[in-house]
Amino acid sequence: MSDGQKTKTTVDIYGQQFTIVGDESKSHMRHVASIVDDKMREINEKNPYLDINKLAVLTAVNVVHDYLKLKEELERLKGQIKEKD
């Protein structure tokens, strides 16, 4: 959001309600929550005996891993573009 106002919305992640506040639109925050929920469910399918805390930490580790891979790919692509200029 560009006007400096905070947006507040309630989301459901892994069966729990969370109220989140941020600078982005409600739809963006819901999308983020949906990705977290999906990732938690995906990990839980492979590791059904994890308690909720371990599941949350493992989800965070996986999401950050994915983020870093994408960031590295972005830097690689930027380097390729720069070489062509």
UniProtKB/Swiss-Prot annotation:
It comes from Bacillus licheniformis (strain ATCC 14580 / DSM 13 / JCM 2505 / CCUG 7422 / NBRC 12200 / NCIMB 9375 / NCTC 10341 / NRRL NRS-1264 / Gibson 46). Activator of cell division through the inhibition of FtsZ GTPase activity, therefore promoting FtsZ assembly into bundles of protofilaments necessary for the formation of the division Z ring. It is recruited early at mid-cell but it is not essential for cell division. Keywords: Cell cycle, Cell division, Coiled coil, Cytoplasm, Septation. HAMAP family: ZapA_type2 (MF_02013). The keyword Chaperone does not apply. This is Cell division protein ZapA. Belongs to the ZapA family. Type 2 subfamily. PANTHER family: CELL DIVISION PROTEIN ZAPA. It is found in: Cytoplasm. Residues 60-85 form a coiled coil. Homodimer. Interacts with FtsZ. GO terms for cellular component: cell division site; cell septum; cytosol; plasma membrane. SUPFAM superfamilies: Cell division protein ZapA-like. Signal peptide: none annotated. InterPro entries: Bac_CellDiv_Activator, Cell_div_ZapA-like, Cell_div_ZapA-like_sf, Cell_div_ZapA_firmicutes. The gene is zapA. GO terms for biological process: division septum assembly; FtsZ-dependent cytokinesis; septin ring assembly.
